[in-house]
């Protein structure tokens, strides 16, 4: 009897099942990494907008305010277009009472000496969160990832 070269049906099916498992695992991991990328980018964009607002207050020797609309999940720096956060992202804003004109809006005011009204923004996306702290005395803006303090 001659030996035939090639693969049996069982061998081909085993390989296909293994490929399906690997593809499923990769797709699952990619979805988590996409969320991580989106929340990191949104957080860094908001930090950049806050720092821009602070620098404009110092350069122009005049108060400047960045407004956050919690209901519409957006923010606007002075003289800039409104920026909307990605779909599914949640916001929690803690700001000075004087900078909260309504339940759905809050702001961060920066003064000509660089100081601010201070506060905190927490961005939540799935099981991930980033926090932005704005120091009232110095106006320093710091970004903290997930579990950092």
Can you name each region flagged by the protein language model?
Residues 2, 13, 25-51, 55, ...:
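N-terminal helix-rich module
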Residues 15-23:
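Hydrophobic membrane-insertion alpha-helices, especially the h-region
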């Amino acid at each position: 009897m001659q030996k035939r070269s090639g693969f049996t049906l069982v061998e081909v099916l085993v390989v296909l099942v293994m490929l399906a498992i690997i593809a499923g695992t990769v797709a699952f991991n990619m979805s988590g990494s996409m969320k991580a990328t989106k929340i990191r980018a949104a957080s860094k964009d908001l930090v950049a907008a806050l720092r821009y607002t602070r620098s404009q207050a110092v350069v122009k020797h005049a108060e400047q305010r960045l407004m956050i609309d919690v209901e519409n999940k957006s923010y606007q720096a002075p003289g800039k277009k409104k920026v909307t956060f990605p779909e599914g992202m949640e916001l929690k804003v803690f700001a000075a009472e004087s900078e909260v004109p309504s339940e759905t809006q809050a702001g961060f005011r920066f003064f000509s000496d660089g100081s601010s009204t201070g506060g905190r923004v927490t961005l939540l996306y799935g099981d991930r969160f980033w926090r932005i702290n704005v120091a009232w005395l110095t106006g320093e803006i710091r970004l903290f990832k997930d579990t950092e303090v």
